Amino acid sequence: MQIRDAIITVTNRTDLSQDDAAAVMEQMMNGEATPAQIAALLTALHFKGETDAEIAGMAQVMRAKSLAVPHDGGVVDTCGTGGDHSNTFNISTTAAFVAAGAGATVAKHGNRAMSSKCGSADVLEGLGVNIELDAEGVARCLRQAGIGFMFAPKFHPAMRYAGPVRREIGIRTIFNVLGPLTNPARAEYQVIGVANAGLAEKLANALSKMGIRRALVVHGSDGLDEISISASTLVFDVRAGATPQASTISPSDFGLSLAPREAIAGGSVEENVAMTKAILEGSDTGPRRDIVLLNAAAALVACERADSFGEALRQAQQAIDTGSANQRMQRMIEASNG
């Protein structure tokens, strides 16, 4: 399908097939579509509403065109789609260190702040991590530290055609949800946080269509794009080719107390760096630690290092209490600057 035909199809509120969405994405990524055509299609998809098949088709192409990171397999990514405007501290980034401390290999894919003051790239840079690594540099971090970071702008050169357009039109587009699905390390396991319940189900179905080995797509009922400490969380358990299974979990299921959203609020880069350090060093034992434990546990379940959330939570607690999580952070800083 040509992009002009796709624009007409979507404007008529007809969905694209996964193959047609992929074909159109190829044209956008290869520079075969004009800026006007890209803007028209993105806007039409926005108002029609993107389907899981459209998301899967476009994500497969975008991921295939990213700069691949070599590794030995079995890596997990933890990230959110953003857009919850919650201004929390960097939960998934801190949880990534804890998951690594518990033995997972974490290939984190992220960017600078979108809906908060401090994104994953910002806090990692503040901690002393070199975020400007190429694929081999990230691979070195994975080998030496068990955790690496792929700064999205460096790994998606094909976005040079669509990137300026999506910024200029100024609305949320399908690209806002493609990021977590396009990990350059081709992560076999994922935890993806989503601020909208309907979108969570779409992403779960898209991941299944893309053949993910296992993923958890989570949505806090308070609107958080993480597993929440302030409310229950909707969890879609995704396995390749299978219908995602939905369930609900609550902090109380694991003996953790509910806490108000203000208790996990973030601040400036410097403040968020201090919060991450306090959790990993073991000096913060309050709600911030608890929400990190829950989200690290999700990563351990997703990458099948634990059979249950309860077991995963114990592994996450041990990773902090033994100093292993903090050690992973220090190793990542060293490896990224090596």
UniProtKB/Swiss-Prot annotation:
Molecular functions (GO terms): anthranilate phosphoribosyltransferase activity; magnesium ion binding
EC id: 2.4.2.18
Catalytic activity: N-(5-phospho-beta-D-ribosyl)anthranilate + diphosphate = 5-phospho-alpha-D-ribose 1-diphosphate + anthranilate
Superkingdom of the source species: Bacteria
Keywords assigned: Amino-acid biosynthesis, Aromatic amino acid biosynthesis, Glycosyltransferase, Magnesium, Metal-binding, Transferase, Tryptophan biosynthesis
A GO term from the CC aspect: cytosol
Known role: Catalyzes the transfer of the phosphoribosyl group of 5-phosphorylribose-1-pyrophosphate (PRPP) to anthranilate to yield N-(5'-phosphoribosyl)-anthranilate (PRA).
SUBUNIT field: Homodimer.
The family this protein is said to belong to: Belongs to the anthranilate phosphoribosyltransferase family.
Protein name as annotated: Anthranilate phosphoribosyltransferase
Taxonomic source organism: Herpetosiphon aurantiacus (strain ATCC 23779 / DSM 785 / 114-95)
